[in-house]
Curated annotation (Swiss-Prot):
GO biological process: positive regulation of protein catabolic process; protein ubiquitination
InterPro entries, sorted: Ankyrin-SOCS_box_domain (IPR051573), Ankyrin_rpt (IPR002110), Ankyrin_rpt-contain_sf (IPR036770)
Pfam families for the chain: Ank (PF00023), Ank_2 (PF12796)
Source organism: Fowlpox virus (strain NVSL)
Family annotation (Gene3D superfamilies): Ankyrin repeat-containing domain
Keyword Lipid metabolism: no
Oxidoreductase is among the record's keywords: no
Alphabetical UniProt keywords: ANK repeat, Repeat
ANK repeats: 1-20, 24-53, 57-86, 90-119, 123-151
Name of the protein in its database record: Putative ankyrin repeat protein FPV231
């Protein structure tokens, strides 16, 4: 059935099972995606292939498509309503895969579709940890879609404190520290009492590189406070008004 769309269609017409598995527990759909065969992939999806069936490693066809950097198949699967938060045997979601493989386009597609940026793998690492580790260009996008910078892994570290300082590039450091500074400005006490928040506070305040960035952010916030409108409000109202929207998906910051 693999590779030839005409023959595959004929076999299906004669009753071939579209969800039959091989010894790896892979479906015909897996092989269509593995060979980047858009026509065959579309056929199997149209005939009702179950996109949420996983192989013996608990990997979905979406994991397979991302592993092959198969953007076309990823689009087809997302449009077909696949569960993008399925976890493999190591707890990695499709978003973990996309971040680790540094595929910005697929990462943005997953986030725009609603993929959860705070799902942990078996080591309790979220995609943000891997984004910092691999110097990903998607850190800002993760933050905008609700990634929690204060989440703690199984070693009691946040994504920032668990990543070697010298590894993180300047842009990503600026994104994380900027978000933390805004959070420090508007967060309620229950957030500030969380372990991850305290860890990041100590790290940022006691690291020269991080604290310098934070000081610049504080200066910019003070400049906003100094800007007065005719209504009597200052520009800091934009920070205050964002408070109702800012704690989304485990307190992920949504403004930059």
């Amino acid at each position: 059935m693999f590779g030839n769309t005409t023959i595959s269609k004929m076999l299906l017409d004669y009753g071939a099972r579209i969800d039959s598995r091989n010894k790896e527990e892979c479906l015909p759909l897996n092989h269509a995606i593995a060979t980047n065969n858009k026509e065959l992939t579309s056929l199997f999806l149209a005939r009702g292939a179950d996109t949420n069936i996983v192989d013996k490693y608990n990997r979905s066809v979406l994991h397979k498509a991302i592993g092959n950097n198969n953007i076309t198949s990823v689009k087809l699967l997302l449009n077909h309503g696949i569960d993008y938060n399925l976890r493999d045997n190591h707890g990695y979601t499709a978003l973990h895969y996309a971040i680790t493989l540094q595929n910005r386009e697929i990462t943005d597609m997953l986030l725009s579709s609603g993929a959860d940026p705070n799902i942990m793998n078996n080591e309790k690492h979220t995609p943000l940890y891997h984004a910092l580790l691999y110097r990903s260009s998607n850190v800002e996008s993760l933050i905008l879609h609700g990634a929690d910078i204060n989440i703690v892994d199984d070693t009691g570290k946040t994504p920032l404190s668990n990543t070697y300082i010298d590894i993180i590039d300047n842009k990503n450091i600026e994104v994380i520290v900027s978000q933390f500074t805004i959070l420090e400005y508007i967060a309620p006490d229950d957030i500030k009492n969380q372990l991850g928040y305290k860890i990041n506070t100590d790290l940022i305040n006691n690291n020269k590189r991080y604290s310098t960035i934070k000081q610049k952010c504080v200066h910019e916030i003070n400049l906003l406070k100094a800007i007065k409108f005719h209504s009597g409000y200052s520009a800091e109202i934009f920070l205050i008004k964002s408070k109702s929207n800012i704690f989304h998906n485990s307190q992920g910051i949504q403004i930059l």
